[in-house]
Amino acid sequence: MTAPRSRAPTTRARGDTEALCSPEDGWVKVHPSPGTMLFREILHGQLGYTEGQGVYNVVRSSEATTRQLQAAIFHALLNATTYRDLEADWLGHVAARGLQPQRLVRRYRNAREADIAGVAERVFDTWRNTLRTTLLDFAHGLVACFAPGGPSGPSSFPKYIDWLTCLGLVPILRKRQEGGVTQGLRAFLKQHPLTRQLATVAEAAERAGPGFFELALAFDSTRVADYDRVYIYYNHRRGDWLVRDPISGQRGECLVLWPPLWTGDRLVFDSPVQRLFPEIVACHSLREHAHVCRLRNTASVKVLLGRKSDSERGVAGAARVVNKVLGEDDETKAGSAASRLVRLIINMKGMRHVGDINDTVRSYLDEAGGHLIDAPAVDGTLPGFGKGGNSRGSAGQDQGGRAPQLRQAFRTAVVNNINGVLEGYINNLFGTIERLRETNAGLATQLQERDRELRRATAGALERQQRAADLAAESVTGGCGSRPAGADLLRADYDIIDVSKSMDDDTYVANSFQHPYIPSYAQDLERLSRLWEHELVRCFKILCHRNNQGQETSISYSSGAIAAFVAPYFESVLRAPRVGAPITGSDVILGEEELWDAVFKKTRLQTYLTDIAALFVADVQHAALPPPPSPVGADFRPGASPRGRSRSRSPGRTARGAPDQGGGIGHRDGRRDGRR
């Protein structure tokens, strides 16, 4: 398949490119533009990279073109051989080793005829395999001469595929000249020793040499334009294309493999990236939106607090602190009225039930009651206070009976007074709670109104900023789609949240994060990956190899892909002569030696070698036959019949019963001539 080539306008001067490509004449500049440059950035993964996009690495691989070039060189070299040259090299080899049929038979005269034929076949197979290896080494050197035009050369196949994937067309610059490929080929053919040692190689190189030099000149004279240093113009009125190198001013031609569509104001290319562009931009915008949401709304609020031990939490911890403050902890073992009173207050704070009041007060009175009630009174029975006697005993009995009653009355009075105080305090608390509840209701209403106003203001600001960003992106991409204009991202502020009122002695905040909604794009990425894979596989006719479990093992060019893309590369881009028939998809995955064997079997050289081998084996078998018996003894043995003698005559003898002319002399002379 040969793709159409554009016609370069030649009606104007070479240096008048700007005037030539004026919009008044119907010319528009289609490359470079923001859209076409973005296409190449997509191929480089600037807007994201998916698993399906990895198929493109196989598409732009030069493996298929390398195999096509190798097959062309192998075919040309092997088909340039002649029977005469092969026979001359074979006879020279036989003479050099002393393997003529007669000598071979004399050397193995005691062996059977079949064994001698096997030796002859083995001798020829050795020479044939050596010749094939020698020719392969020579052909490998020929292929290496075309390395400057390989994947990294000016006429590289990957650049050709890049242009097709982005725009569906290829700009080509031609300048007929001898470059590195031609010079390397000439030096190789001149200096290689095989051209002086083997007639087969020398004559084949001489016959195929002109074709090799034309192919090398095609590589040297062709340059696929670089994507970022070429201008492409299109005349939608005449359908013409113009290619110009802005650095050197050189003009070229444009190979249009997939014609684009002119919509009246712009050109829509028929290419894989053009078809995938809306989905790529949409998925990229979604990822950017999720990233902005993460930066804007996920500001971390870090609050680091120390956690108290179990022995220092609650009422017990407060009592321990008070003991330390008053200097009356377990270490000092001291006590005072102030410390006992503070402990009473702390114990009353930790009460959970009304019945705990009696226990709390009782423990306090047990601790301090001896100082308040059981203080020793003045003993009147002592000397100096009157008579002791019986009065002393009776006084002691009265005090012993009145002490428990007094202590119980004191406790009851203290408990009643505390209950009264607590009841009044609780009533005051209920009143305060009601007033605070009414105040909180009013504040909550005001807070809701402020929140609504804040949300409206935030939504309006975001909408204005989004509209401005969309307009900037459209101006950058030329209307092809949205793209980040390079604006600074919104700076996320840290939010301060006061949670102190919601914490008690048993809770603390180690770290806190806000978790707002962030859109998920995993499904969109998976869908885009499948789109990439389907588009590349179907557009470039890539063949997927799978095992018995259905798992993909490898992917390669199919026969259809070679005919659709590799053949136009040699015919329309390089304009290479006599490349030969396109290889098949199964040939692409072969190695160099495997491809050589496959080509070797299809050329005339294989037929010539088979014929020479058959003749050599036949000569050896003929030389191994025993000599025929001498006819002299049969003519003169006693009792020989005339019929037996007549059989040994030449084909020109007379018929049976005719008179013998010349007798046995002529017969003997004939036999002597036959022996000679």
From Swiss-Prot:
Q: Name one Pfam family in it.
A: Herpes_UL6
List the InterPro entries: Herpes_Portal
**GO-annotated biological processes:** chromosome organization
Q: Where in the cell is it found?
A: Virion; Host nucleus
Q: Where is the composition biased (Basic and acidic residues)?
A: 666-676
Main location per the UniProt record: virion
- Consequence when changing residue 254 to A: Complete loss of portal ring formation
Q: What is the effect of changing residue 145 to A?
A: Complete loss of nuclear localization
User: Which keywords does the record carry?
Assistant: Disulfide bond, Host nucleus, Viral genome packaging, Viral release from host cell, Virion
Provide the residue span(s) of the region labelled Disordered: 383-404, 627-676
Gene Ontology CC, one term: host cell nucleus
In residue numbers, the region (Putative leucine zipper motif) covers: 422-443
How would you summarize the oligomeric state and partners of this protein? Homododecamerizes. Interacts with terminase subunits TRM1 and TRM3.
Q: What job does this protein perform?
A: Forms a portal in the viral capsid through which viral DNA is translocated during DNA packaging. Assembles as a dodecamer at a single fivefold axe of the T=16 icosahedric capsid. Binds to the molecular motor that translocates the viral DNA, termed terminase.
Family statement drawn from the similarity comment of this UniProt entry: Belongs to the herpesviridae portal protein family.
- Tell me what this protein is called: Portal protein
**What's the source species for this entry?**
Human herpesvirus 1 (strain 17) (HHV-1)
